[in-house]
Amino acid sequence: MGTESGIRNMTAGSPFRHILMFTLPLLAGNFLQQFYNMVDSWVVGNFVSDGALAAVGVGFPVIFLFTSLFSGIATGGTVVIAQSFGGGRPDRVRSAIDSLYTAFIRSILPITAAALLLVNPLMTVLRVDPAAWAETRTYLLVVCAGLVGSIGYNLNAGILGGMGNSSTTLLFLAVSTILNIFLDLALVLAVPLGVLGVALGTVIAQLCSWLFGIWYINRRYPQLAIHPFNGIFDRKLFCEIIRIGLPSGIQMSLVALGAMGVLSKVNSYGKAFTAGFNVGNKLDTLSFLPVQSLAAAVISFVGQNMGASREDRVRQGVRITVTMAVVWTVLSSAFVVWLSVPLSRIFSPDPAVIAASVRYLQCVMPPYVLFAILFVLNSAMRGAGDSLYPMVNVVASVILLRVPFLYLLANRFGPDAMYWSYGIGWAVACVLSVYHYAAGKWRGKYRSE
């Protein structure tokens, strides 16, 4: 089967073609988002201050912490919807959508309030440079107040992803990105609001993208219509979504805490080092986007085929996806390291910032292929309904290995040595994930009822 109005049935036909065609719109959307992030960093770094650039960089893991729980639940929704669609259960798809949005509407205000209250304590834990404190606080307060748009967008994307539709998600991202860039330029250059303008632009764009997404889905896909305030909540089905999605959300939250632990150490070396770290992080994230897109594709592919009882296609699809991820990561890592100086110079003319960014890339990019394998295999296991093991594996590698080793190496050998901890954590986690997948321990996790 192929596609109908963007909805893709991946239980028959070429796995390579399905995965590739699902990945391409996601990849385009992710590049759009990163293009905005680069424009954002370019505007802030060149027209505001290094303090503002550090503020935006520090803000990312904090915002990720607050959105990660619902992002995980959205992943659980993607898996349940994919399995239900692959198994020919449109009634179950409908119930999953209603249950997801009912839970979202009931919990968004408490989540937002908690985020606002935790801004100052988290900044203290992160040891934000006093020179960047005011700008960081402004950025975080504004973006936390607008979490509804970011979380709502993730829910819409999760619903469509389960149905094999990534092209419509690209449309939503395009709306957000174009509006975000326009607002960035208007509120920073035309109206000099500084980091406040950047934060307002982000919140307004995300909110508009979410609301546009609801309108578009309801108009184009009536069978998936979203009813935020009058959907029927299916407690049993939502528990299945939570079973799959909560470990993923907890994993992302704890990884965000681990990232804040890293930032706490990074921030202790001053504004220039922090800004350089953030520039390097943006560049490595950009090179990793295809793997993230492939991982999202394999979740939907595995979910649909588990629902259709096609485990043979699951294994075939995973092999194809891992191969594509490895080839891309090796090539992109070499390219980014080779051009690390001119790429870093795009974001800041400061030699100290450039030096910190280059060193980050030289240490982190070579072992990235291990993370690519780990990322795809964990996503495949989530698609099969096994999300507890990936959570334990990744959390152990980050919290128990990366962060302690980072502090140990930095204290013993200096700030550049902290980056070696990335490869150590990825190597251990990758070996464990390969073993878990090869042993078939993810099988039997799918529940059709």
Short names for language-model regions:
Residues 1-23, 81-148, 190-246, 302-367, ...:
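Short alpha-helical transmembrane segments in multi-pass integral membrane proteins
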Residues 10-47, 61-76, 80, 105-112, ...:
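N-terminal transmembrane alpha-helices
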Residues 21-40, 142, 176, 205-209, ...:
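Transmembrane helical elements of multi-pass membrane transporters/channels
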Residues 26, 30, 42, 79, ...:
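Transmembrane alpha-helix boundary and packing residues in multipass membrane permease domains
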Residues 35-53, 123-130, 186-193, 253-282, ...:
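Helix-terminus/linker motif at the lipid-water interface of multi-pass membrane proteins
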Residues 53-113, 150-169, 263, 277-340, ...:
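Small-residue-rich hydrophobic transmembrane alpha-helices
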Residues 65-68, 180-184, 210-214, 286-289, ...:
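Hydrophobic transmembrane alpha-helices of multi-pass small-molecule transporters
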Residues 74, 142-161, 169-177, 198-211, ...:
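Short runs within selected transmembrane alpha-helices of multi-pass transporters and secretion channels
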